[in-house]
Amino acid sequence: MNNIRKTHPLMKIVNSSFIDLPAPSNISSWWNFGSLLGICLIAQILTGLFLAMHYTSDTMTAFSSVTHICRDVNYGWLIRYLHANGASMFFICLFLHVGRGLYYGSYMYLETWNIGVLLLFAVMATAFMGYVLPWGQMSFWGATVITNLLSAIPYIGTNLVEWIWGGFSVDKATLTRFFAFHFILPFIVAALAGVHLLFLHETGSNNPSGLNSDTDKIPFHPYYTIKDILGALIMITALTSLVLFSPDMLGDPDNYIPANPLNTPPHIKPEWYFLFAYAILRSIPNKLGGVLALVLSIAILTIIPLLHTAKQRSMMFRPMSQCLFWILVADLLTLTWIGGQPVEHPFVVIGQLASVIYFMLILLIMPITSMIENQLLKW
């Protein structure tokens, strides 16, 4: 009798994806983040589902319904903070996952990479709309500022913004549709993640050396299942520690003030994971220019495979490129810091410099350095 795991139509998909999958023998802990992102997504969908059972998407009751969840629902506070901080864990894993892809040249798998960029956009959209739902001051003003950016689009801008708002300002219609989109998008993300995996399994995983690993493969289970479980336990420990000890550390205190269209907060800023893009947006004095830079700061990832000039895939044996990669990481951390600062001297200048360095590194300095390294290989 054949093993049901290998014959059953559904089981054999699971088997070929998570059990008998041939994996390179040398992939490091940087390859753990795919599974961690899957765990994050499942956790977000589950906690979100339970929150949606008690949440009301009406401007009059949204804020108090979130308060009700925290005070009156059994373990409502836990579900709410797991969901809010789960988003932060999601983005930490996302950024590390993308960073891994950049460092080890995983972007050479074009379909997998481009679907990944699409996933990044989808998760960012989901997180933005989720931030609007508690209807606090930062929710309202964040929604107003970010949706208003679309008015920079020539000719159709103003009509587009009013169409998204469902009126002449951010109001009940906006909140209701944002809730609807926030509910449906994670399922679209899950479907995209399935396609992401499908394309990845067409080629097999990359590995730290960037070399073909067909000659040395090991089964995914038990080697990488146990490794992924360890990674998951570390992440879950970090998340529960954050939720139980300082759940509001990453949030904005202004969001505990109910939304008031007549009173603008002194510093409007998004959640920490959007600050780098927000800093790039603010560093350009022109509205349309800022919006384009904001979109390009993420969309630039799609052209990274075209900018790969090195003869080696991975940065493992390219010390000059490694150095530039870590400069890029430092630059993104600088942008994140600047995004949370007020618009005044010297933060404006630092933000502008960091933005220029960001685009220069990716578009010019890194490809040229790779070409220099190619020449050094001949020595």
UniProtKB/Swiss-Prot annotation:
Q: Which CDD domains match?
A: cytochrome_b_C, Cytochrome_b_N
What does this protein need as cofactor? heme b
State where a ubiquinone binds.
Answer: H201
Q: Which PROSITE patterns match?
A: CYTB_CTER, CYTB_NTER
Instruction: Quote the record's binding site residues for heme b b566.
Output: H97, H196
Q: Where in the cell is it found?
A: Mitochondrion inner membrane
Main localization is mitochondrion
A GO molecular function term, named singly, is: ubiquinol-cytochrome-c reductase activity
Q: Where are the transmembrane segments?
A: 33-53, 77-98, 113-133, 178-198, 226-246, 288-308, 320-340, 347-367
Q: Which positions bind heme b b562? A: H83, H182
What are the protein's UniProt keywords?
A: Electron transport, Heme, Iron, Membrane, Metal-binding, Mitochondrion, Mitochondrion inner membrane, Respiratory chain, Transmembrane, Transmembrane helix, Transport, Ubiquinone
Disulfides per UniProt: none
From the UniProt record, list the coiled-coil ranges: none
Which BP terms in the Gene Ontology apply to this protein? mitochondrial electron transport, ubiquinol to cytochrome c
Q: Which SUPFAM superfamilies match?
A: a domain/subunit of cytochrome bc1 complex (Ubiquinol-cytochrome c reductase), Transmembrane di-heme cytochromes
Q: What else is known?
A: Heme 1 (or BL or b562) is low-potential and absorbs at about 562 nm, and heme 2 (or BH or b566) is high-potential and absorbs at about 566 nm.
Q: What is this protein's record name?
A: Cytochrome b
Give the gene symbol.
MT-CYB
